[in-house]
Amino acid sequence: MKRFLLNLLAVVVVAVAFSRCAGVSSLLKEGKPDEIYAKALEYYHKKKFNRASTLFEGVQRIYLGTTREDSITFYNAHCKFLSHDYETAATLFDDFRRRFGRSVFVEDAEGMYAECYYRMSPAAERDQTTTSKAIIAINEFISRYPESDKIDYFRELNDELTLRLHKKAYLNAYTYYKIGRYKSAIVALRNALRTYPESNYREELMFLIVDSNYRLASNSVASKQTDRYLAMLDSALSFGEEFPESKHIKEVNRMMDEARKYLDRSKKTEDNNIE
């Protein structure tokens, strides 16, 4: 009996879905443009965005060059956005803002274009190309609409995404450090600081430069150790000046002591050889 009821329910669901699709298809085939447009708006306001989008797309060509063209294009893009199809929505909003620069919807379209990329932006561990696009779009919106009532919201999005890029740069550099490729780590860490000097990871980046320099020097052949310990001391002094109260300061001081001891021994050996 239970199985019968489940099968019956499935049939009913399919039948209802089919009837709705049939209703939309029938309207597109037999309905007048104004009727289709009105029904699309009705579905839109009832939050039935897939059906609304189908109808908007069905009459889009009919209204080309009319006063309804921009509204149909905007509502269709918004349906995609509200259905979480952000990739399609971004394409449609981008097309809208280029074609309808004077539309009453253009500010909303610009904002949602930026927000599409924000919502598609992945976690910091993944490629951040989309995040960079989102930041560009968000800053374009902020620049064009400084009086918008959404300006604070978009500034918050910008800050969030910027922090994500900071984290990505840190993680990329840390990966080299973690696998023991200290020369590559030093380059990547310095590039991260150069690209994002205000990074929230600045202290950690600078400490890892010190540590990478120390490990590189410690594991180098004798002919390269002096120069590498000197480079380590330079980075350690910079770290100490900027972060004198850091949780890493004791470790940095320890590495500096070891480096100085090595340099002192090396100097004495060199002096003895001269004598």
Predicted segments — roles?
Residues L6-V12:
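Sec-dependent N-terminal signal peptides
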Residues K2-L6, A17-E275:
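Acidic, polar-rich low-complexity tracts and alpha-helical solenoid repeat scaffolds
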